[in-house]
């Protein structure tokens, strides 16, 4: 199968296409005008050039096969690879957004949009609380397949070209186990879809030896660590990878992560009833993160079929958060979106068509 044109960075296309300025023109057609056929690019491309593009590349390599709609406005997308028919999911999230008008000081209300993308079909990490791992690991997604998730979702929701998206690598898969394709996708998000790296978050279960490699690339993205426990015994029961990279090992690498002024590393902490949601756990978490510029994002466990875990009460989550905030550690509780369509954290999976 010919490569997808979405797999190429602007620099790579500039080296492949002659004259090289054609690369920028092609990028505009792809990412600013959503063109899905080379024949639709005839305004400034000759028939011969279009024929050469058709000979070298394909465009779309995935398609939307189903969309689930949540009462909160979120949507879960089931994508199918046109190459091997494997499926994977991504989520479109709508959030309320408030801004202050600099001239009038009036509060302006609007919406901000986040796409939670997948980077693998299945996952190798095998977190016990996550539904994705039940299907095992199939393969890595190409950069083009990651990019097309955001493109197709933006197109399906009729969002203006200029409307910025937030991208979070929190769907199916471990981003650091597909680092090359993830980094290429981030570059294309930036130069193609004009998404600032500051709007992109990479969430990892703690592949400690890949964190410095990501840091060296200096992409300017937000780093999020799926911590979920304050001791190695509990964390290993939740995240088997912890047996290889324990909490101390992960935190040592996080301490070296380059941070801009006023930026913090995000630690995601999944609250599970009677396992890691006590005030004593909050105290241990405070001690663990001492000296790290960090913020904690609490996630209430999202139930799924066959899970042995239970969701804690919102009251216990608030007590946990209030304690950390009172001690100066910024802590928020993530609003669970799309629970009614099984699209919340830890609920995505491959589906057989």
UniProtKB/Swiss-Prot annotation:
Binding annotation for [4Fe-4S] cluster: 123, 127, 130
Active-site residues annotated for this sequence: 89 (proton acceptor), 345 (s-methylcysteine intermediate)
Key word Transmembrane helix present: no
Pfam families per UniProt: Radical_SAM, RlmN_N
Organism: Helicobacter acinonychis (strain Sheeba)
Cellular localisation: Cytoplasm
Annotated protein name in UniProt: Dual-specificity RNA methyltransferase RlmN
Residues binding S-adenosyl-L-methionine, per UniProt: 173-174, 203, 226-228, 302
Catalysis performed (reactions): adenosine(2503) in 23S rRNA + 2 reduced [2Fe-2S]-[ferredoxin] + 2 S-adenosyl-L-methionine = 2-methyladenosine(2503) in 23S rRNA + 5'-deoxyadenosine + L-methionine + 2 oxidized [2Fe-2S]-[ferredoxin] + S-adenosyl-L-homocysteine; adenosine(37) in tRNA + 2 reduced [2Fe-2S]-[ferredoxin] + 2 S-adenosyl-L-methionine = 2-methyladenosine(37) in tRNA + 5'-deoxyadenosine + L-methionine + 2 oxidized [2Fe-2S]-[ferredoxin] + S-adenosyl-L-homocysteine
GO molecular function terms attached to this record: 4 iron, 4 sulfur cluster binding; metal ion binding; rRNA (adenine(2503)-C2-)-methyltransferase activity; rRNA binding; tRNA (adenine(37)-C2)-methyltransferase activity; tRNA binding
